[in-house]
């Protein structure tokens, strides 16, 4: 359907994994697409790009990059475990409005550019 946007488990994307990180990047893409439509720019296509840090065993973690064509895991490393802890903190702050994850996109689009 035109003008219908879906994120997360409800999408028709069949590739695993359906992660919270992927839903986050889908949401950012939906915001960008709606703003493009409001300003008369063309639709954009989401390529499935997402990244996330995950906990591993002990003091290690992994960093994962994925898109529709490939996935790559980096690690194990204590640095990636620290990144996961940091990302969690930023996520909860964004829900409280302390950190605005859409600010970059908003500034770009409201300044008149795609």
Range-by-range predicted roles:
Residues 1-2:
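Rossmann-fold NAD(P)-binding glycine/threonine-rich loop
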Residues 10-56, 63-65:
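A conserved FAD-binding loop/helix module that cradles the flavin
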Residues 63-114:
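C-terminal auxiliary extensions adjacent to catalytic cores
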């Amino acid at each position: 359907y035109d003008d219908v946007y879906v994120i997360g488990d409800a999408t028709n994307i069949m590739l695993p994994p359906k992660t919270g990180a992927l839903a986050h990047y889908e949401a950012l893409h939906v915001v960008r697409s709606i703003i493009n439509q409001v300003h008369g720019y063309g639709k954009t296509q989401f390529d499935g790009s997402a990244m996330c840090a995950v906990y591993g065993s002990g003091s290690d973690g992994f960093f994962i990059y994925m898109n529709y064509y490939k996935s790559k895991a980096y690690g194990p490393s204590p640095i990636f475990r620290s990144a996961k802890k940091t990302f969690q903190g930023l996520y909860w702050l964004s829900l409280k409005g302390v950190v605005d994850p859409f600010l970059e996109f908003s500034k770009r689009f409201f300044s008149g550019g795609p």
